[in-house]
């Protein structure tokens, strides 16, 4: 059986979203499905729609290319028909409009089953500013119409229906072969190293931890806590939330901004770390229940971690510290006391999530829509 994994943007091997997409494609292949990946590429300004390493459609450069890549989907439909594709896995880019609706309608007419993944839901609150709200408005006008054309909506949330369509609930998965297990347990008698890895958005709430460190160091403690932030700031808002606190409270020796890291550099930082920091402010974007990929990656590394949302895969795990979903500073003393009680090894933490492999998660979708 043949499938097409369809996304509406480009790929960057160092980017977390791109890694996730590759994991999902490989998982579908591991389930016995001949899966091709359709994505956009822009070498030298030219807009290309790709199928794996082959060019499907060349839209050219300039304004024309920018428009065509957003409205020309007939080449995808024709490819799916020609190649006898029977299943389309489409990753939403919040781009419901007459063109995507027509594309899915044509696929369904050809007998192709189409599901759409919504990576984060709800997502309206993520659109801040007039220009971004304009883009969202188009999606809001057409997303229920698009949803009616689908065989299902894949979600990592606990929502049973989205846009009036039944959901296929899965968890963000893990490709264990791609994530290195932490090899050593560090001496934490005098210091504790925390790590947060993300493209830094306001909903990660890293500012809550930095505020907690400011409060903690105001008492001149002997026990030292360090926070390693690994990733680039998404925008000025995130910089303004974090950088002034570091400067005002003279935390430069305790909060390190590493920028984006991957590969062996990232592995070394995880070896130095003792505990990880998940999202601490998903409530800022209106989300209470979510199954983030980052939580799973931390567990696969073998680290205990903290977060503030509800993640049903981790709620009762002994290596999880839940903090309130509010704007309070993180209590560093409580975090230290929690860590001191930890007894599980990195391997034991990793083994606790074996059921969250990407192959298991993607197989749920296959079974749900009865692909054969």
What residues fall within each predicted segment?
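Conserved donor-binding/catalytic core segment of Leloir-type glycosyltransferases
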Residues: 186-204, 210-213, 228
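Membrane-proximal helix-turn-helix segments that form the acceptor-binding/catalytic region
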Residues: 26, 74, 98, 102-109, ...
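N-terminal subdomain of nucleotide-sugar transferases
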Residues: 1-44, 83
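Nucleotide-activated donor-binding/catalytic signature segment of Leloir-type glycosyltransferases, i.e.
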Residues: 239-264, 272
């Amino acid at each position: 059986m043949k499938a097409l994994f369809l996304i509406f943007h480009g790929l960057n091997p160092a980017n977390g979203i791109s890694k996730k997409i590759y994991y999902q494609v490989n998982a579908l292949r591991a389930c016995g499905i001949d899966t091709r990946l359709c994505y956009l590429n822009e070498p030298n300004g030219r807009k290309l729609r790709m199928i794996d390493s082959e060019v499907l459609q060349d839209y050219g450069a300039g304004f024309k290319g920018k428009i065509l890549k957003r409205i020309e989907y007939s080449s995808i439909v024709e490819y799916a028909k020609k190649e006898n594709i029977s299943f389309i896995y489409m990753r939403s880019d919040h781009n419901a409009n007459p063109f995507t609706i027509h594309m899915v309608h044509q696929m369904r007419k050809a007998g192709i089953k189409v599901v759409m993944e919504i990576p984060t839901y709800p997502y309206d609150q993520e659109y801040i500013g007039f220009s971004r709200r304009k883009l969202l408005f188009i999606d809001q006008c057409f997303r229920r119409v698009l949803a009616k054309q689908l065989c299902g909506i894949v979600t990592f949330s606990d929502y049973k229906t989205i846009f009036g369509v039944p959901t296929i609930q899965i968890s963000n998965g893990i490709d264990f072969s791609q994530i290195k297990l932490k090899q050593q347990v560090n001496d934490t008698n005098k210091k504790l190293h925390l790590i947060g890895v993300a493209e830094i958005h306001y909903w990660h709430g890293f500012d809550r931890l930095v505020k907690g460190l400011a409060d903690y160091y105001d008492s001149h403690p002997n026990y030292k806590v360090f926070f390693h932030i690994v990733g680039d700031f998404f925008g000025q808002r995130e910089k303004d939330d974090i950088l002034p606190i570091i400067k005002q409270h003279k935390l430069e020796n305790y909060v390190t901004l590493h920028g984006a890291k991957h590969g062996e550099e990232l592995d070394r930082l995880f070896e130095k770390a003792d505990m990880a920091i998940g999202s601490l402010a998903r409530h800022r974007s209106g989300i209470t229940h979510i199954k983030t990929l980052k939580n799973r990656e931390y567990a696969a590394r073998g680290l205990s971690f903290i977060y503030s949302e509800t993640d049903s895969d981790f709620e009762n795990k002994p290596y999880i510290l839940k903090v309130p979903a509010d704007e309070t500073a993180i209590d560093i003393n409580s975090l230290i006391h929690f860590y001191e009680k930890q007894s599980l090894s990195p391997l034991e933490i990793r083994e606790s999530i074996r059921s969250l492999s990407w192959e298991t998660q993607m197989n749920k979708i296959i079974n749900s829509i009865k692909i054969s």
